[in-house]
Regions:
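Non-catalytic, mostly N-terminal accessory regions of nucleic-acid modification and defense proteins
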Residues: 1-188
Length: 189
């Protein structure tokens, strides 16, 4: 554990889930008459998919520019519905990279040499055994679909603190406490 690939997978998958849920939360709370269509008996993802293209553009313009824009095919619910496809690993990776590309102007970082680092990248190539890539992607989506961060948005909860603690625990032990020495663990804070 705790290699660079594990770090990328954990942070990107949790960030994807966070952004998916944040996007839904913002849509449902948007100051727009269209938002009412997303809070009924139908799941918001289905209602969002059923909006016309113009309605989707209008409601997207009503939410904060601090939230990446997602299309219906980017949503976790859409991935969940495609799990039985044999090339699910490709579908998963394409979804991640498409979100990154469509939001690159705002949600990417740059190196000192002006190279853009995307929000997401293909994750299944980190699985060495190609036959295990689709099952790996299915397992990730299985974990993501059954919980929601929406309650955390109203409470301003820092969910990344637990992930950060997991990632640095071995470094602090094996490295003599030099990494993240100024970080206060969530349990103490």
């Amino acid at each position: 554990g705790n290699d660079g690939n594990e770090y990328k997978i954990i942070t990107q998958v949790f960030l994807y889930k966070f952004l998916n849920d944040k996007f839904g939360y913002e849509l449902k709370n948007a100051k727009s008459d269209i938002a009412k269509k997303l809070t009924g008996d139908v799941k918001w993802e289905t209602a969002y998919e059923n909006l016309s293209g113009d309605e989707r553009m209008l409601i997207q313009s009503a939410i904060s520019p601090d939230v990446p824009m997602l299309e219906p095919y980017h949503l976790i619910a859409n991935l969940w519905n495609q799990q039985s496809k044999g090339d699910f690993d490709t579908i998963f990776d394409s979804t991640m990279t498409d979100i990154a590309e469509k939001n690159a102007d705002i949600f990417s970082t740059q190196t000192t040499a002006n190279t853009r680092i995307p929000l997401f990248e293909a994750l299944t190539p980190f699985v060495t055994d190609t036959a295990q890539r689709a099952p790996f992607a299915r397992a990730l989506v299985d974990k993501l679909v059954n919980f929601s961060f929406e309650e955390a948005f109203a409470q301003n909860y820092d969910f990344f603190s637990s992930i950060f603690e997991y990632l640095i625990k071995d470094y602090n032990t094996a490295g003599g406490g030099k990494y993240a020495e100024y970080y206060t663990p969530h349990a103490i804070a």
